[in-house]
């Protein structure tokens, strides 16, 4: 079991590399992965069940202690990312299926790896976990409402169908995970240790399935979609950080806000696009999944160095006094 837990930690720490490698392989050899499309929704449900296994009441203590900070993060997330997505679709005159895909990923809750990036960045982990949990729990209502509001100009959107899908693939597995944790107690500890491995394998399969199903369209429009995805993610980080600065939050909390706003649950975006629209609509989510793990790792390294520099300046100032 220790070896499996160690493997799980290694795979979790190298998540971005696995997603990138298998996305490239799926693009070069789509026939190897084309049959995996039917696994997208069940695998996302498995990831959400794992999230439920790890959720604790303490994760929501930050909501009680600093409700306005959590509310600020949640509002920033559901305003900035959908808004930027809509503006990018207008600016680039994106085709309907791609536009819906970009808006869809923009309307998803915070990403599953944002907490890890916040920890690496020396951000406020409690705030990060609280924002991720609250945005995920609000997703069954807010995500379909925002998609309907922003994407209906391009393609027909059914609020109720999206609502039921998110309820089944996000909220229900999380609730089942929380119940399992309560009933089994310490017996789920070993399962929790291997969750990073299960999550990484699941997301990798989701990304490869989407890339394989849309290989021809990616070859045709991939550079345009990638440019939009990179801009979307970057504006999320930037506007999230400066929202924290505008409200005079400390550096650690500005980092948390940047990462929670900029990183999306792109697995959910891919699942919803595959189930309700077309394989092409899932491509922005798949590319977002690859890119935000790379950019998140780079940004967290930069943020950590900011803190180290701040620590050195504080120490020098104290020594001078």
Positions of PLM-derived features:
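Alpha-helical transmembrane segments of multi-pass small-molecule/ion transporters
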Residues: 1-321
């Amino acid at each position: 079991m220790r070896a499996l837990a160690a493997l799980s930690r290694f795979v979790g720490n190298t998540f971005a590399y696995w997603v990138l490698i298998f996305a490239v392989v799926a693009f070069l050899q789509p026939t190897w992965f084309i049959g995996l499309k039917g696994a997208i929704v069940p695998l996302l449900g498995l990831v959400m069940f794992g999230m439920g296994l790890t959720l604790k009441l303490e994760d929501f203590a930050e909501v009680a202690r600093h409700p306005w900070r959590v509310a600020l993060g949640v509002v920033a997330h559901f305003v900035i990312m959908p808004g930027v997505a809509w503006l990018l679709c207008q600016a680039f005159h994106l085709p309907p299926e791609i536009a819906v895909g970009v808006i869809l990923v923009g309307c998803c809750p915070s990403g599953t790896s944002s907490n890890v990036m916040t920890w690496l960045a020396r951000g406020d982990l409690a705030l990060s976990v609280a924002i991720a949990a609250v945005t995920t729990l609000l997703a069954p209502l807010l995500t379909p409402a925002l998609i309907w509001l922003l994407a209906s100009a391009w393609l027909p959107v059914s609020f109720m169908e999206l609502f039921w899908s998110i309820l089944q693939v996000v909220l229900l597995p999380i609730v089942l995970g929380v119940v399992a944790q309560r009933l089994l107690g310490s017996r789920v500890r070993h399962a929790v240790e291997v969750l990073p491995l299960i999550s990484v394998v699941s997301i990798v399969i989701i990304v490869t399935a989407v890339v394989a199903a849309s290989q021809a369209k990616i070859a045709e429009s991939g550079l345009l979609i990638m440019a939009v995805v990179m801009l979307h993610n970057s504006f999320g980080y930037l506007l999230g950080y400066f929202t924290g600065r505008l409200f005079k939050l400390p550096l650690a909390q500005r980092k948390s806000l940047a990462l929670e706003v900029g990183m999306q649950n792109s697995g959910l975006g891919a699942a919803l696009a595959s189930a309700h629209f077309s394989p092409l609509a899932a491509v922005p989510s798949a590319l977002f999944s690859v890119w935000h793990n790379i950019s998140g790792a780079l940004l967290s390294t930069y943020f950590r160095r900011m803190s180290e520099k701040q620590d050195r300046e504080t120490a020098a100032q104290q020594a001078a006094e």
